[in-house]
Amino acid sequence: MGRAPCCDKMAVKKGPWSTEEDAVLKSYIEKHGTGNNWISLPQRIGIKRCGKSCRLRWLNYLRPNLKHGGFTDEEDYIICSLYITIGSRWSIIASQLPGRTDNDIKNYWNTRLKKKLLSKQGKAFHQQLNVKFERGTTSSSSSQNQIQIFHDENTKSNQTLYNQVVDPSMRAFAMEEQSMIKNQILEPFSWEPNKVLFDVDYDAAASSYHHHASPSLNSMSSTSSIGTNNSSLQMSHYTVNHNDHDQPDMFFMDGFENFQAELFDEIANNNTVENGFDGTEILINNNYLDHDISSFIDYPLYDNE
């Protein structure tokens, strides 16, 4: 059951107050006061308004000690500080600002102050992003320059050491041998950019190869199987004799960038003793690998030309 209405809503006037109504209400209250009864006040002064409307009009607009006009910077600071502390409790905030009503403060916050703060915060945020971006770009450029300088110096030192230690005749022989092996390996096949060449045995030269189509790493020879769940590595396998370890075991593999990650996942998901690529037994569990994984993950022998 709700509260009883203070007056007949059909007999009262609604909408903005006129200048004459403001003058009548203000003059009567200044002379006689409210009498602590806002419900009967409209009848006493002879205006067709609701008692609640008269009370709000007096408190928010007609009181002599009210401040009208824009808010000062000090008032903005007080409003923001209290809003952060107690939220939108406008009557308490108004008690700290003499001459300001809770309704004025609420309207000012929703229409102007909040938008102004958001605009300043957005500008400061973008400025902070620009500063961080400039610092990051400078730091990245400096890091890249340092890496390039270190790489150049390391390359020069390695070349100098190689020239001092290796005999010139041996260098020529090594280059010639490397060229011959390269021609023997690449001549029978057409090079595809998305495939990477691996050579498990760099010292042995290949004489002939037999092609065996293999949809995944699992279909390689039984002596070089690592897991039973890996079916995403598509490749073609080339071998001479799996039982002859003197011959090289070479294969092309698609998607090399995912190979190491998938291989480590395969190792982490199994807890068995398996055979490595070279036929030796390796112990695999979730935390321990007895055989160094880098011994059978080789980098490309030659660059794509």
UniProtKB/Swiss-Prot annotation:
Which ranges does the entry annotate as DNA-binding region? 38-62, 90-113
Keyword check for Transferase: no
State the source organism's domain of life.
Eukaryota
Gene Ontology MF terms in the entry: DNA binding; DNA-binding transcription factor activity
Q: Which UniProt keywords apply?
A: Activator, Developmental protein, DNA-binding, Nucleus, Repeat, Repressor, Transcription, Transcription regulation
Domain HTH myb-type, which positions?
A: 9-66, 67-117
InterPro entries named in the record: Homeodomain-like_sf, Myb_dom, SANT/Myb
Task: Tell me which CDD domains the record gives.
Answer: SANT (cd00167)
Location comes to:
Nucleus
The record's account of tissue expression is: Expressed in roots, leaves, internodes, shoot tips and flowers.
Query: Which cellular component appears as one GO term in the record?
Result: nucleus
Q: Which GO terms describe its biological process?
A: plant-type cell wall organization
Q: Give a single Pfam family match.
A: Myb_DNA-binding
The record's section on PROSITE patterns has: HTH_MYB
Q: Which PANTHER family match?
A: OS09G0431300 PROTEIN (PTHR48000), TRANSCRIPTION FACTOR MYB87 (PTHR48000:SF75)
Function statement: Transcription factor that functions as a regulator of genes affecting cell wall organization and remodeling. Activates genes related to the primary cell wall and represses genes related to the secondary cell wall and expansins. Required for the regulation of longitudinal cell growth in stems, leaves, petioles, roots, flowers and siliques.
Q: From the Swiss-Prot or TrEMBL record, give the protein name.
A: Transcription factor MYB87
Q: Give the organism, scientific name.
A: Arabidopsis thaliana (Mouse-ear cress)
Provide the gene name from the record. Answer: MYB87
